[in-house]
């Protein structure tokens, strides 16, 4: 498991129901571009606005459509819900799950470790830990290390953490466990992660510019660092959309609309789309 993995948006219709036709189009588009994997029920996919049943249906539909490495987000504030969703992911044939640390309530490190260990013990499926301290309880390097060394099915981590120190600390775990995977969740950290010894990225902008992420990946794998750096600079520019929009999800969907994708600019409440002024600024960046 490596390379460019896309955390899919969840397309919605005007009535806020899931647009499965648009979802299928997006998956096929990304596969044609050559991405290495698909990740459904992600932060980008507004998983917190979906019901448990919708998350299961979405996971099933994605598995039906894609032939690539397939990951399902099974995070929740409830450990038992995580176990339920993770069991479901295994039943439908997912290649692995991505589990964000519990959010809303602040937890101590031992509680976070217990949360993940309970899932790892209950469900034998590859698990990728998801560290995103801006939205959920932080996962310390020591907790990641302990989980990686104690549970063979904890195979890696996705780090949406704006810190090279944290990223390099994760990669040091590979010295003790060679097959441990380290993915960045930040587009601007994609190349730095590869240079440090990481395995790829699970990045939101790959929904609408996967060709640039693949340029970085392919150039790096061929040893053409100059070309990889040039493409990585494009990604840094594109991530400016996040500082323009009022929310992460709004930025990504507006960028997709700006590039002419058959995706409606609709978010599930309480999220709201930004207006025309923000759209014009994002269009200038991504066009």
From Swiss-Prot:
It holds the Pfam family DHDPS. Its main location: cytoplasm. CDD domains: DHDPS-like. It comes from the Archaea. SUPFAM superfamilies: Aldolase. The active site is at 43 (charge relay system), 104 (charge relay system), 130 (proton donor), 158 (schiff-base intermediate with substrate). Keywords: Cytoplasm, Lyase, Schiff base. One of its GO terms (biological process) is small molecule metabolic process. One of its GO terms (cellular component) is cytoplasm. This is Uncharacterized DapA-like lyase PH0847. It is found in: Cytoplasm. Its EC number is 4.-.-.-. PROSITE patterns: DHDPS_2 (PS00666). GO terms for molecular function: 2-dehydro-3-deoxy-phosphogluconate aldolase activity; 4-hydroxy-tetrahydrodipicolinate synthase activity. Homotetramer. It is an enzyme of class 4 (lyase). Belongs to the DapA family.
